[in-house]
Amino acid sequence: MTAKVIQMSSNDSAEVIRQCLQVLDSITSDSSVPRNIRRSVNEIMDILNNESEPLFLRAASSISILEDISNDPNLPLHTRTLIWNLSSQLETIPVDE
């Protein structure tokens, strides 16, 4: 049995980034999210929008910050779920782009 490798095109990766930025924007406008979390989310948005860095590096940096803030005890549950979903989406971006 052979495994199929699914290649993600750069358009797919760009769409993942676009969708993640939309969710991140909604988190920053949610007043129930603590200010320190919103600051971190703004930092992630800046990282993802920085096109001078390779896409996989931007995704990895963002995932690292998302992991840190997902452990914050003051994070509302609905936001924690969004953050886990964002991490999962960013993990789909291939390293070789």
Swiss-Prot record:
HAMAP family: UPF0147 (MF_00342)
Gene3D superfamilies for this protein: Ta0600-like
Matches recorded under InterPro entries: Ta0600-like_sf, UPF0147
Family that this chain belongs to: Belongs to the UPF0147 family.
Pfam families: UPF0147 (PF03685)
Protein's organism: Methanosarcina acetivorans (strain ATCC 35395 / DSM 2834 / JCM 12185 / C2A)
Region forming the signal peptide: none
Name of the protein described by the UniProt record: UPF0147 protein MA_0092
